[in-house]
Design a protein with these regions (language model features):
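Glycine-rich, phosphate-binding/catalytic loops in enzymes
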Residues: 23-25, 101-102, 139-140
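Accessory terminal helices/loops
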Residues: 110-120, 129-195
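Residue-level signal for inorganic ion chemistry
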Residues: 10, 22, 87, 125, ...
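Active-site HxH/HxHxD metal-binding segment of metal-dependent hydrolases
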Residues: 4-61, 151-155
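Catalytic core of the metallo-beta-lactamase
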Residues: 4, 40-136, 193
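Short hydrophobic/aromatic-enriched beta-strand-loop microsegments
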Residues: 27-34, 84-86, 142-147
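Generic secondary-structure boundary/loop-capping signal
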Residues: 19, 37, 44, 50, ...
Length: 195
């Protein structure tokens, strides 16, 4: 096995803690947001918002999606229809606001909503079942959500991963993506922080 690139969505240790070991063991290149260069260990390649990053046969559009952290980015492999989103968006949820503001996170989620809805979403953590309980509490009549929860439970029962998810499913079921304005998003985020 050879790991050539380490794609860093943000500087939190659970996402960048292995960078130096990957560089040492595989001579991997560390890619991250230029504004976070002092917080991402071993960074080699600096990327910025709306840049197309190329590596051999792969191309990814970089999206700056602040909210969880100020320097959070996403890698959109648009030809393959895959989005590596880190901790900005989770299946049926979104990341906590640590450095950013509710408005920044709301705007970042709106940016994601403009990506083609047949895109696969790869997030940084698996909180799907817990997130589903919160969504159901606040959107109890949503049949799409109820069906997604049944699918999640079936997958977990059979030892299958619930990820990736598709953006089209998240648009129908994820209450954070359905929030109409910053105020309603902020209320949901505050409720989720204490759920």
């Amino acid at each position: 096995m050879c790991i050539r690139d380490s794609l860093n969505t943000h500087h939190h240790y659970d996402h960048v803690g292995g960078n130096l070991e990957l560089k040492r063991k595989y001579n991997s290149k560390v890619i991250g947001f230029k504004e976070d260069k002092k917080r991402i260990p071993g960074i080699d390649i600096l990327v910025e918002d709306n840049q197309i990053w190329n590596e051999d046969n792969f191309e990814a559009k970089i999206y700056h999606v602040p909210g969880h952290t100020s320097g959070h980015i996403a890698f959109h492999f648009f030809k393959e229809k895959k989005l590596f989103i880190g901790d900005t968006l989770f299946s049926l949820g979104c990341g906590r606001i640590f450095e950013g503001t509710n408005e920044e996170m709301f705007n970042s989620l709106n940016k994601i909503k403009k990506i083609p809805d047949d895109t696969e979403i790869y997030c940084g953590h698996e909180y799907t079942l817990q997130n589903s309980k919160f969504c159901l509490t606040h959107d109890s009549t949503n049949l799409n959500l109820k069906n997604k929860i049944l699918e999640i439970e079936r997958k977990l029962k059979n030892g299958l991963p619930t990820m990736p998810t598709f953006l089209k499913d998240e648009l129908k079921c994820n209450i954070f993506l359905k929030a109409k304005d910053v105020e309603s998003f902020s209320k949901l985020r505050d409720l989720k922080d204490n759920f």
